[in-house]
Amino acid sequence: MTEQMTVRGTLKGHSGWVTQIATTPKYPDMILSASRDKSIIMWKLTRDETNYGIPQRSLKGHSHFVSDVVISSDGQFALSGAWDGTLRLWDLTTGLTTRRFVGHTKDVLSVAFSADNRQIVSGSRDKTIKLWNTLGVCKYTIQDEGHTEWVSCVRFSPNSSNPIIVSCGWDKMVKVWNLANCKLKTNHIGHTGYLNTVTVSPDGSLCASGGKDGQAMLWDLNEGKHLYTLDSGDVINALCFSPNRYWLCAATGPSIKIWDLEGKIIVDELRQEVISTNSKAEPPQCTSLAWSADGQTLFAGYTDNLIRVWQVTIGTR
């Protein structure tokens, strides 16, 4: 008996690429998605056969593509970043913006909350990483030994005993920063193309990075060294660890690959069936990934504006 993924349905509501998806253990029937349609949709998951969920509320305010969205650990707030150069903090009970964060001089590509929700980090096309408090005050701008190209992704480690930020950029570098003094801790060198994404494991012990070269590189955050590399065969747009299995999930071109990290083998490859009359039509690319908090459901956002939903099932392959 093996675990595999079974398609469960779709979420329709966006009119632009789905750039990010956020879930929270506090509200298992809600997810948020960010899009190039400049909005964030709050979904109510119905788990119906036809429609897996319905758009409950649209968070509007950004004047350009929304690139990233995360939910605070209490499930009350969302944080977004957009190509309008700003971050926004949203009250999810009212759907209103409670704070605007102004300071980046170019598109914001990535945002994150610290484990205690007291700190916010953002990465931008202005090549800087900024640390903010929740009142919208920029406390620090990381430029020393910083990225020399666009900062495509920033993430906090969930491990409070090793307070770090991990970032990656179009300079092919993965950088680990000491949160206490905002100084560079480690440069992870090895990628041969620009980077789109970095993700930290649930226990904070390792991170994975990916981008143009199609290699998912795994790094030990405690030792500061390269562990191993998994070849996805196509550009990696998003990566995420399963919250409860030793799996790494990669959005790679039009498909999703799931690796079992113990055996470094592919558990499953998820492709959506595209019924197309024009064989030259480019299949939609997978641009975002998020697991439900219980690790049973995978949400994936695409360039055809849909979110596709898979579930872990026991199969007899």
UniProtKB/Swiss-Prot annotation:
Ranges for the WD repeats: 13-44, 61-91, 103-133, 146-178, 190-220, 231-260, 281-311
Keyword list, A-Z: Cytoplasm, Repeat, Ribonucleoprotein, Ribosomal protein, WD repeat
GO molecular function, one term: ribosome binding
Gene encoding the protein: gnb2l1
Keyword Ribosomal protein attached: yes
Name this protein carries in UniProt: Small ribosomal subunit protein RACK1
One GO term (biological process): regulation of establishment of cell polarity
Family membership: Belongs to the WD repeat G protein beta family. Ribosomal protein RACK1 subfamily.
Function: Involved in the recruitment, assembly and/or regulation of a variety of signaling molecules. Interacts with a wide variety of proteins and plays a role in many cellular processes. Required for VANGL2 membrane localization, inhibits Wnt signaling and regulates cellular polarization and oriented cell division during gastrulation.
Transmembrane segment boundaries: none
One matching Pfam family: WD40
